[in-house]
Amino acid sequence: MTELTQKIGHYRYRILALVFMATTINYFDRSIVAVMAPTLQKLFDWSNKDYAAIMVSFKIAYGLGLLFMGGIIDRLGTKIGYTISIVIWSIFGMLHAAIRPAFSLIGFIVARFGLGIGESGNFPAAIKTVAEWFPKKDRAFATGIFDASTSVGAILAPFIVGAIVSVNGDNWQIPFLITGLLSSLWVVLWLKTYQKPEVHPKLSKEELAYINSDSEEETTEKIPWVKLLPKRETWAFALTTLTDGVWWFYLFWGAKFLAEQFGVNIQNIGLPFLIIFIMADMGSLLGGYTSGALIKKGWTINKARKITMLVCAIIILPVSFVPVIASKWIAVFLIGLAAAGHESWSINGYTLVPDVFPKKAVASVIGIGKMLGVAVAIIADIALGAVLDTAGNSGYFWAFIIAGSSYLVILGFVHLLMPKMTPLDDNLNYIKN
């Protein structure tokens, strides 16, 4: 550690660690039902249609919640807004454990809906936290660190749940209670630790100056989301979130595809998923580091972000060939490579918002974009299910073609909408250099 680094300090990374913890809990909680799906379906006599209704309930709530949770976080501030989000998902997460067999379907639909509302606040709050605590040149890397925790949560879920829950469903309630307790612990740590950098008593003057080194002065007036919708920059970011459906395809349909294509079962799905999500984590960290390093070398933010996203789009292309590959491990590698590219794409896409918008609009813009991404993911799930029912496994061919090619197409439209990434001031007017 250099003398300059010691002088500046690193308290901002304590805040980032809490965001990492929250996002890990978020994805672990989200993955529990998917991991236990075969056991729960047998235990509660659910049909596939019943299970689909539970999943769609979560996604609908998540999409709707993204719209207003972002606004709540912008209006109430990051500290209170993030707390409200995780308290909601803690309550509904633990509510799963109280559901009785006679009301299992409606109970899980309600619980997943509430969970979706609460969890929808995580990413808007996390991005806003990074915008408040990191200078622009470090935001992509910081976003990459916390975004990597999505894979951590997805990796931990099958191992922890498998160690607790028996094959016949004994102890199925315990994972929901564990996540509720972890979330409660997080709330205590968050309320004790978080303040805005400008008023935080443990932040050095040198670190505060570093955080604000490339930030503009802003007013405290909040920007209504209706004023954000006409901005091309809002829709440029929203387009990048359309790829969320691809990520959820890997997360929720990946195990099913590997089972039907390569005979992978619940006992040996762990290693393929471990490889895929570790690669995703590596992509998340590398993507954030790369664009940040390019900015530090003198590249414009516009060039650094878009070139990094272009590289991501290119390395994702080979996943289109997965349905025609005979080797399970080559298929796993290509899915992992695509997951890595997606995570790198995603964190650079997120940082477009604080790069362009004032801090007070960040959570709302993120919420608008993510809501659109979830809506597309819901439509994609319905369409894929229908195609698989009518055309069989050949439906995966088109799913992977879209998953592989969509990033390049979307990046082209992002550049058309936002060719120069000119920053906006508090009144959403362009800041002239």
PLM region spans:
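A late C-terminal transmembrane helix in Major Facilitator Superfamily
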Residues: S284, P354-T390
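C-terminal ends and interior cores of transmembrane alpha-helices
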Residues: V87-A102, L310-A326
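Glycine-rich segments within core transmembrane alpha-helices of 12-TM secondary carriers
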Residues: A140-G162, S166, A280-S284, K370-A380
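Central cavity-lining transmembrane alpha-helices of secondary-active solute carriers
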Residues: V56-G71, L274-G287
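Extracytoplasmic gate region of multi-pass secondary transporters
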Residues: V33-A34, P230-G287, H342, S346, ...
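Cytoplasmic helix-loop-helix junction between adjacent transmembrane helices
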Residues: A111-S151
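Helix-loop-helix hairpin linking two adjacent transmembrane segments in secondary transporters
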Residues: F146-E198
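Conserved MFS/SLC helix-loop-helix module at the cytosolic interface between two early adjacent transmembrane helices
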Residues: L64-L105
